[in-house]
Each structure stands twice: as structure tokens, then as C-alpha cells.
């Protein structure tokens, strides 16, 4: 009977290890698909608030992207499409 218990407990360990590895893959995928650090949405909102003090902008016309170029260099890119003020 102890021989069967040995195989059963080993199978549970393997199942637990497999579940842990799958969960780590899912978490890593979710982190990479977010596209940026946790502070990026708040940074975007703060930048919008400051820019709105000076010009009228549409929040849907703004993109904020953080690109990691190397271990020491990240580039924050902010693109704003301003409304055309021309009347006519």
C-alpha cells in the first residue's frame, strides 16, 4: 500500500508544480500585455490635467506609450492631436 501512496503523492506534487508553472505563465503574459508600468494610467491623467489648463483637447486623441530601449533607457512618448481651430 505504501508503494501506491508514493505514486499518488508524487502525482499530486507534479500536478501542483504544473499548475504553478501555468499560473506563472499566465501572470507573465498579463503583465506583458498591459503594455506598461502600473503608474502609466495615472501619469497619463496627470498630463491631461496639466495640458487642459492651456488648450482644449479630446482625451481620445491622446496616446501615451512607454518603450524600453535597453536596461538603462526607457522612452516615454506622448502624442496629442489638437483640434483644428480654423473656422470657415
Curated annotation (Swiss-Prot):
Keyword Cell inner membrane: no
TM region(s), chain numbering: none
GO BP terms: cell division; regulation of division septum assembly
Keywords: Cell cycle, Cell division
Taxonomic placement: Bacteria, Pseudomonadati, Pseudomonadota, Gammaproteobacteria, Aeromonadales
Free-text function comment from the UniProt entry: Prevents the cell division inhibition by proteins MinC and MinD at internal division sites while permitting inhibition at polar sites. This ensures cell division at the proper site by restricting the formation of a division septum at the midpoint of the long axis of the cell.
Gene behind the chain: minE
Family: Belongs to the MinE family.
Name of the protein this chain belongs to: Cell division topological specificity factor
Species assigned in the record: Aeromonas salmonicida (strain A449)
One Pfam family this sequence matches: MinE
UniProt cross-references to NCBIfam families, sorted A to Z: minE, PRK00296.1
